[in-house]
Amino acid sequence: MIDVCNMQQIKLLLAKYGFHFSKSKGQNFLNQRWVPEQIVQGSQIDKDCGVIEIGPGFGPLTQELCKAAGKVVALELDTTLKPVLAETVGEFDNLEIIFTDAMKVDLPALVEEKFQDLRPAACANLPYYITSPVLTKLLESKCFSSVTVMVQKEVAQRICAKAGAGDYSSFTVLCNYYGEPELLFDVPAHCFIPQPKVTSAVVRLKIRKDPPAEILDEGMFFRTVRAAFAQRRKTLLNCLSASFGEFGKEELTRIMESVGLAPSIRGETLDIPQFAALSNALLQAKEGK
């Protein structure tokens, strides 16, 4: 098996296939074997798992996933990698590579088709520019037991942030609504070719079987969260007033106070149970109109 984390092997592959890294696709490939090994270990992947991998690149993580998992389905956008992957991971009979845009894939249908008797998990080294939409799609698909991603460290910290922290955001709430995130380890820039300008980090999200709070309507919940973070320096009352035109400020004040929230509070200080209580109260008030 070709060691695609060996710089000499990487250079040979680059020369053999005339491959050029694409900045527009955010291609930064791993060149250190310990990284994919630790990702698989931290992901808790075993032979009972079926894994969707997004963006295999040259296949270093794919190799480790195939060793550990029952089956791996890798989704790759760049068709110029087809001959490279045939050489680097072609020997694995538990691997299927689909050349497609992961953002256009019906993930629940794919998981149902490929992993009928396996516990589905997702694993990805995500390009920085598409981290949020891909991770959101993985979580909203509600078809995985866990999702493990390598992202920019700043994004990893945002995913794991606590209410009131400077990096707490609507994306934090979304990630924690669907899963329980754990920051596994950092990955220095020198572990990639070409080297990015930032440090990366690996985060594992154990997907929740049930929401962390009672929520009457997901749409209203996330509408409330988006409104709360739309203007970080404004009070929650002003943020809600700007986004919920169907309510006057006096009515919004009464709704907030009914769930124990002062009108002067800022949205970024609310945790998920508080957002749940507020969104439920807003929904009930709207339905009562």
Residue spans of the language-model regions?
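Short amphipathic alpha-helix in the helical subdomain of ABC transporter nucleotide-binding domains
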Residues: 249-252
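Conserved catalytic loop of SAM-dependent methyltransferase domains
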Residues: 230
